[in-house]
Amino acid sequence: RRQTGSPPAGGARQPLPYEELAKLASSVVMLQVYDDQNQCYKTGSGVLINGSGYILTNFHVAAGGRYYGVLLEEETEVFYTDELIKYNQDLDLAILRMEKRRAPIPIYRGPEPLVRGQKVVAIGSPLGLFNTVSDGIISGFRTVGRRSMLQFTAPTSHGSSGGALLDLYGNLIGVITAGFDDGQNLNLAVDYQSILEFARGLL
């Protein structure tokens, strides 16, 4: 059984070893986005957020897709879905649903605030390289439009969008959404508060 999330009140908080955090990649998927001609024209990442097959990703990953291929760790089969349950372009978030079930990653709910310098782990599929795991720190807090963003240093590349940014306790603190080609390790994620607002009623 996975040990993730915040401990019970009064319990000592013990960070998970990196090896255990890396195992959470089993709840992070690679997405293939198909057009009307049944061609896969882009890829991204997504995070399972409940036990009913709901996948959280970026709107800009899901946008324009006729249907989606979902790749899971330890599965040779590709699972297909055309169920776009919900999206919000301002928050750059979307939720897909697939029939396959997997354990979700819990979303951070506090009570301690995130802090600059806090260690984080990123899991995504940059450049189509399935479920790459990297680590770094929170380097800042930004606001972009309606989005509260976490700036972090864990290396990511194109295809990581929609991937998971985790704290060291296995909680989802952000959805990776942007990187800057001209800025080394300058990456942004939509933060957990925006995720909780967007996914209310679906968790």
Language model features: what each stretch is:
Residues 133-145, 188-191:
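Short, compositionally biased
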Residues 47, 156-176:
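Catalytic nucleophile loop of clan PA
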Residues 46-48, 82-84, 138, 165:
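Conserved hydrophobic positions within beta-strands
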Residues 1-48, 54-59, 67, 198-202:
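N-terminal activation segment of mature serine protease catalytic domains
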Residues 50, 58-63, 134, 158, ...:
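Short beta->alpha transition motifs characteristic of CBS
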Residues 41-43, 64, 157-161:
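Short, small/polar residue-rich loop motifs at catalytic or cofactor-binding pockets
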Residues 35-41, 50-124, 128-131, 146-149, ...:
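Conserved active-site neighborhood of the chymotrypsin/trypsin-like protease fold
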Residues 167-203:
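C-terminal subregion of chymotrypsin/trypsin-like serine protease catalytic domains
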